[in-house]
Design a protein with these regions (language model features):
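Domain-level recognition of soluble alpha/beta enzyme cores
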Residues: 22-85, 105, 265, 302-303
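Short amphipathic alpha-helix adjacent to the substrate-entry channel of hydrolases
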Residues: 76-80, 91-114
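The conserved beta1-alpha1 loop
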Residues: 81-88, 232, 255-256
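Alpha/beta-hydrolase active-site loop
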Residues: 127-153, 157, 170, 174, ...
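Short beta-strand/loop motif that positions the catalytic acidic residue
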Residues: 247, 253-255
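C-terminal catalytic-base region of ester-bond hydrolases, centering on the histidine
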Residues: 261-347
Length: 347
């Protein structure tokens, strides 16, 4: 009987996702100012709307394509699961537009904040060094959207997840219950000084006094987060094995498999994944994905355009095989969707 009920729920979910195949993508930008952190958050929110809503394109420029959205459109009725996306160091909510679009079309609300101090147009060291506030940013977004269903749709409070790329991967693992140890990480960097994580950590000037080390070493878990997905995370070697073993929500760890001496899967994502409880964790390495394959697609000629503005940064358009980035994105989005559907079925 239990099996039949589970199968029935699964079929129901599949039908509901299929029914949303032609749904439009609503879009709003909000600012969250409440809080004691003096840390206003710029947040992009994407949500299901009627496919007949008026549309425009956002996120497009000479280097990157955008997506089609309906700005400030009224949300569809009903409850929807919420996914909050955390960008990497120096990134922004634009980096995972492709994922937001794919998830909204499957019936999710997706929210993505710009993290102060580590986002494209705000790289202030004094904000970046408050690394422990990154997970809190995600929690603030959850609180804000739960409190205002009339704006972007009603959130199903039992189906809330977080997805993070690079430093965002560290952010969501902290929300799941991972505990960072500044002492452990700094000791490890003496052995692995060439890792990008060690370089970024030093650039952010993290944990330079006792007070900040105490804040960073605290638990930053949010029990409202019921599942997390990490996309080629950094700073993994600072999360304690004891805290990883105690995580009791579903975790999907995805890694770029294309060789990268500065962010090797073997020392970052895979090393972390083997410390998670196998009963509710999944690890997948994508052989032809680079670290930047999880970011937005690039237009033809984008490498030259980006290099002209910022020499060397055109590398963000490079993938590791014959597949296009769009094909990689399709597979990643499918993996995430399947993982989340399974996570929602767990008691």
């Amino acid at each position: 009987m239990a099996w039949r009920i589970t199968l029935g729920l699964f079929i129901s979910l599949l039908l509901s996702f299929a029914a949303l195949a032609d749904v439009g993508v609503g879009f709003q930008q909000i600012t969250i100012v409440k809080g004691a952190d003096n840390r206003p958050l710029d947040v992009a929110v994407f949500y299901p709307v009627s496919s007949s809503s008026q549309t425009t394109i956002i996120g497009e420029n000479a280097a990157f394509p955008g997506i089609t959205v309906s700005k400030n459109a009224a949300p569809e009725s009903g409850k929807y699961p919420l996914i909050v996306v955390s960008h990497g160091y120096g990134g922004s909510w634009l980096n995972q537009l492709w994922l937001a679009e794919a998830l909204v079309k499957q019936g999710y609300i997706v929210a993505a904040p710009n993290h102060p101090g580590t986002t494209t147009k705000d790289m202030r060291t004094e904000k970046a060094q408050e690394l422990w506030l990154r997970p809190h940013d995600i929690s603030r977004v959850v609180t804000a959207l739960l409190a205002a269903p009339e704006k972007t749709g009603r959130v199903d409070e039992k189906r809330i997840a977080a997805v993070g790329h690079s430093l965002g991967g560290w952010t969501v693992l902290e929300l799941a219950g991972g505990r960072f140890s500044a002492a452990q990480f700094e000791q490890d960097c003496l052995t692995h000084a060439g890792l990008a994580s060690c370089k970024v950590y030093e650039r952010m000037q993290v944990a330079k006094n006792a007070a900040s080390r105490t804040q960073l070493d605290k638990s930053l878990a949010d029990p409202r987060i019921r599942a997390v997905v990490s996309l080629d995370m950094g700073l993994a070697r600072g999360i304690t094995a004891q805290s990883l073993a105690a995580i009791n929500i579903p975790v999907l760890i995805m890694a770029a498999g294309y060789p990268n001496e500065e962010l090797p899967a073997a020392l970052e994502s895979h090393d972390l994944a083997r410390k998670l409880p196998p009963a509710h964790s999944t690890y997948k390495e994508i052989a032809d994905a680079t670290h930047f394959s999880f970011m937005q697609r690039c237009k033809p000629g984008a490498i030259d355009i980006i290099n002209a503005e910022s020499p060397g940064d055109g590398m963000i358009c490079l993938d590791g095989g014959e597949r296009s980035r769009e094909q990689i994105h399709q597979d990643v989005a499918q993996d995430i969707s399947e993982f989340l559907r399974a996570a929602w079925r767990k008691p």
